[in-house]
Amino acid sequence: MTELTKEYIDNLKKIIEEKDDVKARELLKDLYPADIAEIYQKLDLQEAIYLYMLMDGEQAADVLMELDEEDRHKLLKELPNELIAKRFVDNMETDDAVDLMRELDEDTQEEILSHIEDVEQAGDIVDLLKYDEDTAGGLMGTEMIVVNENWSMPKCIDEMRKQAEEVN
């Protein structure tokens, strides 16, 4: 794990200032989302946006969910809703996408939903948003695992592991 020292942060800021995409991606690629979220707190908003644009969609979505709500709002406020849909929501598990959408006003939710490429995911998000956050419906996801009722327990467990990898 990379230690997030002052020197590391200063080096990253220099790389951002120089707009060295290759070096910045190299520094980010092995970091955990929680570490990148910690780095975010030491950057100004434009530096953070620059880094987000360099990450692949899955990493960007994971980092976004690691940010505290206030930092998430600052970032999302600066990005177009179409980009939020394509960069974050399209790369999130449905339950995480719903959690994110709950933080936004209804107009923003509708606009983001209109840009989600996966129509089924958009429908699932709309369905889950109907439930209060603290109810079973508000906490659940829509992904499920199916096994044959006649299978042995070890076969069921193997199949569940296989399907879980496909869902994730």
Question: Over which residues does each language-model region extend?
Answer:
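Hydrophobic packing positions in regular secondary-structure scaffolds
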Residues: 1-168
